[in-house]
Amino acid sequence: MFSAAIGYEILPTLRASVEYHFFDDKHAGMANVTLPDGTSVAKQKTLKHGTHEYLAGMEWDITKRLTVSGGFQKTNYGLSNDFQTDTSFSCDSYSLGFGARVNLTQAWSIDVAYFWTHYNKYTKETDSYNGTGLKGTDIYNRTNKVFGLSLNYKF
């Protein structure tokens, strides 16, 4: 894995950061998959490249008691038809997240957040769908929406 990040305090109450992550998935140890021609190969070898992640975020202290934040993440896995299966698939995506912290006291705070991910549909067309000799198509897709709430105590 390779990671690079930079953060900058624009104002004492406003901060921004950008990050890049690379996961060398093409050289990871994954289980074997059977290709359409019947050969077996380590699944990671079917990727076009490793995973690239691009991130950016901002945080703003509106008051001493209230902080809001927002962020973005774009993920590209380097997918191929041979990598995708009915039991294990991935989809390139982008995510947006928003949050807030309310400082109740110096020790206690409450965080609330919402995170939404849009996954790109991946269409896999084959000439012999599941070995039937007939053309077929699989469309891989998913969605992700997360709400978070926490009560924090600082020792």
Protein language model regions, located:
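Residues that define the transmembrane beta-barrel architecture of outer-membrane proteins
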Residues: 2, 45, 50-54, 92-94, ...
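Oxyanion-binding "anion nests"
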Residues: 2-30
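Repeated loop/turn-to-beta-strand initiation elements of outer-membrane beta-barrel proteins
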Residues: 13-16, 65-68, 102, 106-110
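Transmembrane beta-barrel strands of outer-membrane/channel proteins
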Residues: 18-22, 70-74, 112-116
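Outer-membrane beta-barrel translocator domains and adjoining extracellular loop/strand segments
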Residues: 28-37, 78-87, 122-130
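Extracellular loop and loop/strand-boundary signature of outer-membrane beta-barrel proteins
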Residues: 39-45, 81-88, 133-139
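Outer-membrane beta-barrel "beta-signal"
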Residues: 100-102, 108, 114, 141-155
